[in-house]
Amino acid sequence: MTIEQAMELIHGVAWRGSRPGLARVRELLHRLGDPQDGLQFVHIAGTNGKGSTAAMLASILRAAGYTTGLFTSPYLERFAERMQVNGVPVPDAEFAAVCEALQPCIAAMDDPPTEFELVTAAAMLWFRRRGCDVVVLEVGLGGRLDATNVIAAPACAVITNIGLDHTEILGDTLEQIAREKAGILKPGTRAVSYPQTPEVRAVLHEICAQRGIPLTEADAAAIVPLTDGVDGQTFTYRGAEYTLPLLGAHQLRNAAVALETVTALRARGWRIPDAAVRAGLAQVRWPARFELLRRAPWFVLDGGHNPQCAQTGAGNLARYFPGRRITLLVGVLADKDYPAMLAALDGQAAAYIAATPLSPRALPAAELGDYLKRFGKPVTVCADPAQAAELALAHAAPEDVICAVGSLYMAGAIRMDLRRDHNENSGH
């Protein structure tokens, strides 16, 4: 099977969409020989910060000498990013071979799997074939009925920041959403949580008590920021000092979650030296999360796509670029709460460019442009995200800031274009 045929299989029309329930993925994995049963997991659910926390933990575990799988979604530039071993995305030939093994199993099923279930099963088989010591597994959506929840009790279950997103599927209160996410908490695991709101904290404590699961919550008060700038930050947590290249105060809280997860894993006998923890955090890379792509003019890429992310992004712009003229390059999905996102960001914007993310769920740039006019600032409409980025750069003074925000589906196109441009101009 070629990589093209493999992608055709994965993106096949028969299994579009998201249909909650674990029966299909269970059957598919069983037909594959249950590869997940031979793996150890750190399972991560939450609204925001899942990917960043997963990247930190994978980096730390790798630095500690473990062969580490990482499963995340969505991808930015290439599908292969969704499954990595030791920081390297799945090679085309290996992914094609895994998909070839899937094909007869799918054909034998009466109820065909969804695309996400296929990708999850493919990843499990690949991680098993690669002999991973541990897999850092990010939930796709929710937790309880997510395809990743097919695993037995993980070494550690992590709940990152919980907010309102995907309310049409997960429920429209924080308590309902917390119950869905807490579906990954299985007897026999240890749980670690982000510093949550009181109603979320109450749900997690109740469920962990019912299931006999030890729960640790990261302590925001134990984080002491030391230095902070566009190249990264240093901080102490519970007295130990760390360097983190990811920007924003929220990343310090995500790092605290990763550090508490290390403590939970050590309690289960995992050998993770302090030096590996420091090196893992210092080396972590997680693109399109308030990522600085250019200087003079400054170009920041932030894939945040809900009101909570937008508030964080606005705070980061104020923190790192006070007093500068900021153009917001915005692209959103029509089913997101973009009015609340834009209300949170508007205080930082001098001008707007509206673009259309590369997704069938995208809000067309022209419609977004009309909406943005209510803020009374200059609005330009340029549907193609990469062209919109070029336009913004062409009109910016060296000290100005452009921040592309609103959707990971837009971030990938812009990142690819700007990096290609940079490589061409620098002779790489």
Question: What would you call each of these model-derived segments?
Answer:
Residues 110-111, 118, 131-138, 154-241, ...:
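Acidic, Mg2+-coordinating active-site environments of NTP-dependent enzymes
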Residues 194-216, 230-232, 298-301, 307, ...:
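C-terminal helical cap/extension that packs against the catalytic core
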Residues 18, 22, 26-37, 63-152, ...:
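ATP-dependent carboxylate-amine ligase catalytic core
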Residues 407:
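Active-site-proximal loop/hinge segments that shape catalytic or ion-binding/gating pockets
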Residues 131-133, 323, 397-399:
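Short, high-confidence coil segments that cap the C-terminus of an alpha-helix
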Residues 38, 134-137, 145-158, 162-163, ...:
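Nucleotide phosphate-binding/pyrophosphate-handling subdomain across enzymes
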Residues 74, 194-195, 207-229, 245-249, ...:
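Beta-strand->loop->alpha-helix junctions that form or flank phosphate-binding loops
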